[in-house]
Every structure is written in structure tokens, then in C-alpha cells.
From Swiss-Prot:
GO cellular component terms given for this protein: cytosol
Pfam family, one: eIF-1a
Annotated function: One of the essential components for the initiation of protein synthesis. Stabilizes the binding of IF-2 and IF-3 on the 30S subunit to which N-formylmethionyl-tRNA(fMet) subsequently binds. Helps modulate mRNA selection, yielding the 30S pre-initiation complex (PIC). Upon addition of the 50S ribosomal subunit IF-1, IF-2 and IF-3 are released leaving the mature 70S translation initiation complex.
Subunit structure: Component of the 30S ribosomal translation pre-initiation complex which assembles on the 30S ribosome in the order IF-2 and IF-3, IF-1 and N-formylmethionyl-tRNA(fMet); mRNA recruitment can occur at any time during PIC assembly.
Protein name listed in UniProt: Translation initiation factor IF-1
Length: 72
């Protein structure tokens, strides 16, 4: 378990990158590098450019995150 809670923010996928990584623009204008969470990878959730997603950011490195949800 992590000592610090993750920061959840909304964003939009800008571009897909290799190895299930994505460049995501957050609501506040910042651009982060995000990978897909394990459950999304397991159930083959497809993410395309333009999709609205929820990203968890670590308080230690705000430039990287994990995509935990794709809005319908």
C-alpha cells in the first residue's frame, strides 16, 4: 500500500504511444504521460485519442500517471 494517496484528475487523450502509454492533457492544461491500469489491460479496454479519462497521479511525480477509467 502506498503511504500517500494518489491525486485523481480528469483529462483527454492526445496521442497513443508504444507499450500502452498515452499522452494525456489534464483539465488544468498540463500534459502528462500515462499508462493503462492492470484491470483495463486485462479486460482489453480500448482507449483512442479524444477519449475522456480519469488519471491517478502520484504526489511524488506529477508528470506521470495511471489511467483508471475511460468515460463512455
Amino acid at each position: 500500500m502506498s503511504k500517500e494517496e494518489a491525486i485523481e484528475v480528469e483529462g483527454t487523450v492526445i496521442e497513443p504511444l508504444p507499450n500502452a502509454m498515452f499522452r494525456v492533457e489534464l483539465e488544468n492544461g498540463h500534459v502528462v504521460l500515462a499508462h493503462i491500469s492492470g484491470k483495463m489491460r486485462k479486460y482489453f479496454i480500448k482507449i483512442l485519442p479524444g477519449d475522456k479519462v480519469t488519471v491517478e497521479l502520484s504526489p511524488y511525480d506529477l508528470s506521470r500517471g495511471r489511467i483508471t477509467y475511460r468515460a463512455k
